[in-house]
Amino acid sequence: SESYHHLGFHSESLEPTLAPTRRVIVPEQAGPYIQFQNPGLTDDADAHTMGWPAPELGPEHNANRIITVFPLCSLTLSPNWIGWMRVTPGPAVDRHDVRLLYMVPPDAREWDGFEQTFAPLKQFVEGALQEDMSGLRALSNTHHSKLTDRTAGFSPLEATVAHFQRWIVDRMTAS
C-alpha cells in the first residue's frame, strides 16, 4: 500500500501532515526490502522528518523512515517508538492477518503524558492502516476488472511494486 499513497489513500490522515512535496524517495536497491523517506521540500532537506503521525505530538514522535522486509513485515522508525506491522498469509490467497506492535523504551510508561501521547499515536497509525486496506480493496477490484489494461507498466511512483515483483520472480526462479 505504501506504493499507492499518490492515489490519495490517506487524504484525511497522512496527506495533510506530510511535507508539501508529498513525495517519497524509493532508493534503488536490491534485496528483500524497501525503504521510504520523505525528504521535505528539497532533496537536501532533513530526511529525518516524515511529518507524521500528527504535528501536535512533536518531532520526537514523527516517523523517520519506513522499512518493509518482503513479504512479511514493515517497521516505522521514530526517535521514541517503533511500529512493527507483521503480516501472516491467511487461509485464502486474498486474505492475510495483520498484527500491529508498538515498541517503546522500557521506562516509557513513566514519562509525563505517556498515555495522552501514545493513545492518539495508535489511533492515527491504525486509522491510516484502515485507509490502506480500503484503498487496496479498490486496487484489487481494479486489477480483476475486465476493463483493466494488463499491458501497461508501472508508474515511477510505484517503483516499490516493481521492485517487489522482481524480488518475487528472482526468488521463484533461483536454483
Where are each of the predicted segments found?
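C-terminal catalytic domain of Rieske-type non-heme iron oxygenases
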Residues: S1-S175
